[in-house]
Amino acid sequence: MGQHQSRDDSHGGDRHRHHDAGTSGPTSPSDHDPYPSRTGRGSRRNLVASIVGGGSNNELPERKETAAERQMRRLERERVARVEERERSIREEHVDGGYLVTMGVYTGPEDFNKAIVRQLMIERRVAPFWRGLEDYESDWTEHQLVAAGRGLPIPAADEIPSEDSARPHSSNSTNAPSSNLQNLTVPIASRSQSASYDTSVGRSPSHSSFNTSSPTSPLNAPATSTSLLRPRAKTLGLKSSSKEPSASDSAPREIQLPRDSQVNGQAIEAFLYKDAVECSICLIFYPPYLNRTRCCDQSICSECFVQIKRPDPHTPEHHGPPQPAPDQAEDTEMLVSEPAACPYCQRPEFGVTYEPPPFRRGLVYAKPSRELANFSSAMSSSSSITSPPITSPGLAPRVDNRRRATSLSANDSNVITTDRIRPDWSAKLEAANLRKAKKNAAASALHAAAYVLPGTSENRSYVFGRSRFGRNRSDPDNSGSATPSNRDTSSRTAAESSGQARREGRDSHAARRTRDVEDMMMAEAIRLSIVAEEERKKKAEKEAAKEAAKNAKKQAKEDKKKEKKERKSIYGTNGHSASSSMLNLGNSLAATLTGRRRGDSVASNLATEVTPEEVEEPLQGKGKGVAHPYLGNDGSATDNGLLGTQHLDPSTSSSLLETHQSIPSPTSPDKPSHLRQMSTASSASSSVAESGNGTNPQGSSTSIESPGVTDTNEGNEDGDTGAESMFNFRSLTAMIEKENDNEKTDAVHVENAHEASGSRRGSPDETASQDMDVSMETLRPRDSPQQPKPDHHVPMGLQMPAPKIDTSIVTPQLTLTPDTPALMSPTEENGKQLGSNLQNLSNNEISQ
């Protein structure tokens, strides 16, 4: 850098020396040396200075600026430039009292085209950016309206206005003939447009030549004004160095109208804000000259209008109304961006129209548009209030606030749509689609690369590119062979043959690659199927294990509930009824001694229980010759009529009593009464008695002996001399005949039967002796009442009479009937059913 700067300085110094020499006199030949830097000692001094300067710069290495810092610095410069331009525009430019820049209602980014908006505002096709009022009162005075329109503090209503706001007219605006709009153009022969004029923006700074407030401004006819523009055209035509002469010539040129702050004798701010209206979107008061929507004719300010735009490009499945079918099939995957909808009625293709105020102030174009050409006159400070109305339909003054009856088309010339102020929406949409296409192509390439064999990866991109665009086809429509050429036939034939060979090679390679891809896809499909099957099996096993655990838990819960119910039931194993214990004892004893058990009986136990009504009746017992023990407070078994019994083996009794500890209650509602249990008990007793006569192979004792019971019965009324055995067997026929004589016997209470398997529960061995003592204690009578006369009458219902005890008895009396009949025929066996006539049947006794 230092060397280049030194050379430039040396060249500059040489040029100055040449210029001085040329002006002073003749020059020497050395002055015209084309390479002055190569000769002379000055160049050496500059070279040494540059080296020294470079060395000094190397001592402090300068820090390089990053791209982010450059970007931030550039954005900051642009922001400062925008702020300055905004302040300048507000200070120097306006259109009918409005401004060409936003007033800060919205703080978001301004992404609309400012040049187009500026042009539309100068053409009076869009309302300018009015200064908004936060508050508005309809009874404000003129100087209050002026202060509000200028952004000043609003004074009191009775305050004397200042001279600037109270001055009705300008000193330079008293000439009435100079208020014609057609004569407002100024001569521009003395001012030519610079080559750096920005045609896209179309801005012209305020110059003193545009200030037409001077009374010396020329007032010429339209033809004269046209002739005044002719030198400008000649000047532009002679400029050969201009890069865009046609654009500069066609762009409209801005001019400043005479500065007049009065309209109809009052300030322009008072004229604009005396009938202020509120924008329904931003809720700010503006002059009544606002934009009107083309569809529903609603008011909307320019601040809100420039913020409405199309949505960003997105996929087409997120919007409601169906779009027309695309021409190509691939367009269905393209991004879309719908036109902006009206904020009031939600109709698409949002656009506005504008009716300007009935006067012109500020900037206009030198080449008036169609509306400005038809504009006949403008209202000025010196115009009469009763002046004729404007004849132009587009610029007619607002007569009333009647709404438009019909909506305008989006293609109407007076309608400005949101796409008009944002013409780059199509470019943004195309850019978004291009980015999506590139992303899809990259994803497709990555997906295809996963299925390419390693040996064929080098030619993949070339084949893919050739086959994608169809350049490997041999038809003349897609190749250049159909175009006539001047080449030799032989060379063309050789080229065609070589091209055909290359195409065949590519085709074979593509076919081989296709087969490889298909094989890989098949293998991948098989692998995925195997993985899916394994996952399914694992899931099924898991479900089965879960179901099994659930069933086990449910079964355990049911068992626990059943066990709890059995414990709570009166037939459960927790009861301590002596009668049930003894009945179970008799049944178990019979089964143990005889080695046989009746399997066709529903129940195997029978017990009798004394009801409270039978307590005071005399004791009477009936049965098959078996005396019922009377359990009193004192006395022996001989007084109670208990027959002599033999001793029972302690081991047998403990094993029998081990499983019988409770008796079911006869009043239980859930256990039905089975009268057939009598025969079952009788069969068991018979078997026990038969075994006691000498048939027990083990030779153990088969009789039960209670403490305090003798071998003889002294009080026997039948005259028996010896002790009658407890297990005395008689003929069933004799018992029935004997029973006919004693029909008037007391009622017998029969205890409900229950299943032996449901009421049995084993007890520990250490408690067997205690249970035996408890069971034997129930057989010990305490009183010795008179032995009742045995009665062998058996009722037809196979009911066994219960003994009558007095009130002093606490433990119920038991009756053991371990009689087991001999084998019977089916006819005799059925005779034990309810209602059968047992008198006509015969029973075979077991005889030894």
UniProtKB/Swiss-Prot annotation:
State the residue spans of region: Disordered. 1-67, 154-260, 312-332, 378-411, 466-518, 541-582, 595-800, 813-848
Compositionally biased region (Basic and acidic residues):
1-13, 501-518, 541-569, 736-764, 779-794
Q: Which UniProt keywords apply?
A: Cytoplasm
Cited InterPro entries: Sip5/DA2
Q: Where in the cell is it found?
A: Cytoplasm
Per the record, what is one GO cellular component? cytoplasm
Polar residues composition bias: which ranges?
168-203, 477-500, 571-582, 648-670, 692-713
Q: Where is the composition biased (Low complexity)?
A: 204-218, 239-250, 378-393, 679-691, 833-848
Q: Which PANTHER family match?
A: PROTEIN SIP5 (PTHR31315:SF1)
The record's function comment reads: May negatively regulate the snf1 kinase.
The text of the family note is: Belongs to the SIP5 family.
Protein name (record): Protein sip5
Q: Which organism is it from?
A: Botryotinia fuckeliana (strain B05.10) (Noble rot fungus)
Q: Which gene encodes it?
A: sip5
